[in-house]
Structures are given as structure tokens and as C-alpha cells.
């Protein structure tokens, strides 16, 4: 009987870990949905904190790991996080009240700073999704 309980325990831990991960992903999706929805809403400081927290929960301290790799301004960190969760560049431009070209150039420059290689905005996106 004890052997059976020991065999079940790892499965139970896996199930609990899966549940924790699922909850974290649901939380992130809920937070990100606001950022993806172009309407009259503009994120406040608490919304950005909520976004960072949810991303870090799902993506193994993403913001901390990224900031340890390279210095980022507040705007650059926000663009990196929005890119990580696949918010469209047009929506990012709308959130920052700037042009799509401005966002594309920022993404390109960030890729070059982070990797030390010449690149493009789409290369930045791919790098963010893998990091």
C-alpha cells in the first residue's frame, strides 16, 4: 500500500504543477487581453505592474532576466513585454501614442543592443518569444 502511495505522489505533484501553470497562464491571458484591445482604455502604472508580474509568473522571471542582460528604459521594457505576449505592433504604437515606424525602429535597436548583431524588428520579436 505504501509503495502505491509513493508511486501516486509524483503524479499528484505533476498534476498540481500543471494546475499552477494553467492558473498562471489564465492570469496572464486575462491581463494581456486588456492590452490587446484597442479602445479608449490606457494602462496605468498598476496595469503595467500586473502585466510584468503575470509575465514573470509564466515565463520564469522574464523581466528580471532581460534586465540583467541589458539596461532597458521603462518604455523599452514595456515594448519587450508586449512583444513577448504577442501584442501586435500596431496596438503597441496605439498604446504609446506614437507611429508604427517608431515602434519598429525601437524593436530593431533593442534586438541589436541585446544580441550585438544587426537585425530587424521581426528578428526582435522572434528573439523575445524564445527568450
Regions from the PLM with identified roles:
Residues 42-131:
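Cytosolic nucleotide-binding catalytic cores of signal-transduction proteins
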Residues 1-75:
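Membrane-proximal linker segments that couple transmembrane helices to downstream signaling/catalytic modules
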